[in-house]
């Protein structure tokens, strides 16, 4: 201890700097590695392709999980707006067809910790949010899952977004009442971007 007191202060400071320099370098390397790996896996911009106005063609199974294969078609418009600087978006869907008029709203929120999206859907007929479907995009395909009830039965819901290009995309919803062993598709939407005039 007496040796430290006898050294001039500038030598102590220089010794500390030289001693800590390798540690700071390691910390910078580690934080740089985690930042770059985090940036590679960040899905915050997964839905950027969809911002704008789209013409949509919907096919909907009228009575899912009943053995019925009766479908109805609808045509309409989907408007997608970015919110929260891209960490969310709002979808407004309006469509009409032989089965009537449909209006839906979807609030999609990105969770940066899990790097997943929650898709929260409501339609005008009941005015309530369905349980969110949770998932992510991998290799250009989005898969989202939830558990809901249909006619008093617990079911699984799978929502897939695929075939995404700057001007078109496909959405498919399916239900399973056997724990995901089999899936019955009940909603298909094909969207085509409305070009600016």
Each language-model region and where it sits:
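Hydrophobic small-molecule pocket/channel-lining residues, especially in calycin-type beta-barrels
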Residues: 26-197
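N-terminal secretory signal peptides that target proteins for export/translocation
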Residues: 1-6
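Bacterial N-terminal signal peptides
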Residues: 9-22
